[in-house]
Amino acid sequence: MQAKTVTIKLDKHCYDIIIGPDLIAQAALQIKHSLKQKNFHQMRLAIVTDTNVASLHLDALQAELTKNKIHTFPIIVKAGEQSKSFSTLQVVIDQILAARLERGDCVIAFGGGVIGDLAGFAASMIRRGMNFIQMPTTLLAQIDSSVGGKTGINSRHGKNLIGAFYQPQCVIADTSVLDTLPPREFRAGYAEMVKYGLINQPDFFEWLEKNGQKIFSNGAIRIEAIVRSCQFKATIVARDEYETGERALLNLGHTFGHMLETATAYDSKRLIHGESVAIGMILAHQFSAQLNLVAPTLINRIETHLKAVGLPTQLKDIPGDLPNAETLMALIAQDKKVSQNNLTFILSRGLGQSFIAKNVPPDLVLSFLEQKLTEIR
């Protein structure tokens, strides 16, 4: 099956997202094409990855690069959201500097969203900006986090509060590696795919309702879904690279979702990012319904689809206790969309009719959270 290419055209930078099977075996050619350097074989590549991906795919990638006389330095961190931290960032930076990689060398993010965010942030800072390539290995990273240049780490005050916009030279999305992804991780990525339909693509959401189960099997339908997702995000990012306007729509479900991730201390046994987005999207639509913006039937339809693929949709689906409404509200107040202490949410007026709601009254949000917590206690 031939690889597909989606191009992101920005004001000062243009790069390709290459999507298809068995791309690890073609990595040297793709990297060389993207970096466009005459002394390519003298370059050194730092491969930042995690323990899970390293055990499954690192040998294959290193063998491909070594075969093409490319020097590699693997940097392996612990798998999981807790690696998006200052301490792990320092380890990655220290190892790249210790290897004496130069600005013209390259950092490869070989993993899921955590690795992409972490490695990209490191690349943005080292020598004021190194070459950077994304090689996402999860569905979530292939359709969302590797596309658009957001990098960063978490803080005890909240998720993704420390970071930078730093675009890669290219994104190489090998769809074959998704066959080794645990079902829970694949479902988590699917939540972000559903999000694109709910933002402003009702036809895509309806297509997912018909074809969603096929995406969980490798084949042409899966690749089509990934390509369509990347095309949608590429269009949004091209119009609003630095999230000053419509790119904020991509945060549908994320205000509530990030709140829940922080409240559960980024504990993957309780919640992972895509799951938090699934619950967050339902909460966003329920809050919209409370404001008389959407009909309850739409919420039921979305929830039915998410449940059909095994995603959590309610607070009661999260193991363990949650903080009280006031504590959750304090976490929302740290959301990166907050401006001049005013709350901003992505809400909905119907299927594929999401919008940016500014100056949302805090008392309405607090009352809504209290109601949701009462339902599970």
Curated annotation (Swiss-Prot):
EC number of this enzyme: 4.2.3.4
Pathway: Metabolic intermediate biosynthesis; chorismate biosynthesis; chorismate from D-erythrose 4-phosphate and phosphoenolpyruvate: step 2/7
Protein name listed in UniProt: 3-dehydroquinate synthase
Organism: Bartonella tribocorum (strain CIP 105476 / IBS 506)
UniProt key word Cytoplasm: yes
Reported cofactor(s): Co(2+); Zn(2+); NAD(+)
Primary subcellular site in the record, as a coarse category: cytoplasm
Gene: aroB
Example GO BP: aromatic amino acid family biosynthetic process
